[in-house]
Structure formats: C-alpha cells, structure tokens
Amino acid sequence: MWIRGSLLGFLLTVLASASEPSRSLDDLKVLYVGDRDTARATHFQGFLKENVGKVEFAARNKFKPSDADDFDVVLLDWPQSEATRDEWKSGRSPLGDRDTWNKPTVLLGSAGLNLAVVWKIRGGSG
C-alpha cells in the first residue's frame, strides 16, 4: 500500500513540476521497464492501468533508450540477482549511458543500487 501511495505521489509531483502546463493523470504516458512476466509486474500493470492515461511495458533486457521517447515517465524495475551481477560486470544499463539519459524516471526496488554500480555513481548508505 505504501508503494502505491509513494508512486502516485511521485507521478503527481512530476505533473506538477513539468515545464509545460499541468495535466491530469489521465494524460500521463508511463513506460514500465522490467521483467514483464513476474507477479510484481502484473501488480504494477493493474495499478497503472487504473491510474494513468497510457501505460506500456518493455522487457528490461531488450529495452533501448529510444523506446521511451513517446512517454512522460519511465518506471525502471531492476531487482538484484546473479544475472544483475553479470550486467554490472558488462557495464550495461537498461537506460543506456548516464550522460544521455534525460527522461523523468522512477527507480523501483534495487534499480537505484544497480544503476549506481553500472553508472559508477559514488555514494553511501546508512
């Protein structure tokens, strides 16, 4: 429940802070990037379809940054796993290079940690 409220709050913030005139959530176009066939993705799919104007899903391992061109917000769901550790070693981010990514993005689960590793962002925790 907390995740739903936080996500909805973020989406409202994105709308409120956009440089263009504000729009309702009915006009918001959201792209969920993750592992589509998981219970988590199915849960987000139901929630997003009820609350935003347009939602589409993209497989994280096949996603190209240009796939997000027609969307207002990207939700990246990138869990930790052995496969993720292999992605860390390859230096591949689903969002491409840090310097070229400019789309408003919500990082779900471990996506923040995973991006920090791949994009070599220094920081800490605690």
Name the predicted role of every residue range:
Residues 1-2, 14:
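N-terminal targeting/docking segments
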Residues 2-9:
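Sec-dependent signal peptide recognition
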Residues 10-19:
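Hydrophobic h-region of N-terminal signal peptides that target proteins for export
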Residues 18-73:
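Aromatic-Pro/Gly-enriched surface loop or interdomain linker
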Residues 24, 60, 78-79, 105:
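Generic N-terminal amphipathic/basic segments
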Residues 66-81, 106:
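Short, well-ordered secondary-structure micro-motifs within conserved domains or adaptor modules
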Residues 80-126:
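A glycine-rich, often tryptophan-bearing local segment used as a flexible ligand/cofactor-contacting loop or short
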